[in-house]
Amino acid sequence: MLVKCVLLGLFTLAVFFPRPDQLVRQIPRWKNPDSLIETNAPFLTEINQKIDEQLKPEATKNEEMKAVERFVYREIKYGYDWDVWGNTDYWPTLAEVWQNKREDCDGQAVLTASILRSRGFTDVRIVGNLSHVWVAAGTNEVMSPQADKNFQRVDGKLKVRLPGAKTFLLTWAHINKFPAARSLLLLLAVLILTLHPVWDVKQWWMTFGIGAAGLLLLYDWGGKYLQSSAVGASLGFWTGNLLVLLAIGLAYYTKRPANQPG
């Protein structure tokens, strides 16, 4: 059982983080997102000139932040980390964001925070939750802020709290954007390791079919939830999760030879 758990853990890491080098670099960035804020990049000068051209002389700080937000959204096209970097999550450096010109919310936040700090917003910080990352400076926030803040640095310390139900559902709904092939590979790995040493073809296809049906329902629910959170934890959400768990449960409780407890 221990060997199976280790193998499953390693395979799960490979599915979610196929680039281990990026994962190693990512760990300290998770601990201190604000460490990615830079102000000495040469290209920031040109960026600030372009932003200044869009601002009125009497622009307020909030208007200035909004101008930076518009610039970042215009210049950095949205792309999920698994499409851009391969890994499920990766916080890029400022140079990587500007070079690729394609990032998800964390990369967009890194660029936004760096621009703002270079413009004199000394209290700028990166804020986020389980599903989204944005930027705050004082009491002002940009980059589609959300009410539920799961992490931010306050007085030099990283403050972390558990996500609320809505944040959890929004995060889970993004399964709709996750490569289906990876989800199926993970399901296959779980079922193979759980069924072993039983190799009954009928049992195998039954459990895989049930699990795949569950994933299909979850992908469908996720797409609907991302269009409108009013969908909530609907029947598709509960049925999808239950079918995946049922498949794993059936695989685990499959009758095994007396001398092979699994």
PLM-predicted stretches and their roles:
Residues 1-9:
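N-terminal Sec-pathway targeting helices
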Residues 5, 67, 207-211:
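Alpha-helical transmembrane segments of integral membrane proteins
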Residues 12-103, 136-157, 169-177:
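Secondary-structure boundary elements
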Residues 51, 55, 107-109, 262:
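Low-complexity, compositionally biased segments
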Residues 68, 98-128, 135:
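Cysteine-centered nucleophilic/redox motifs
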Residues 237-246:
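Small-residue-rich transmembrane alpha-helices that serve as helix-helix interface/gating elements
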Residues 249-250:
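C-terminal domain-boundary segment and adjacent tail
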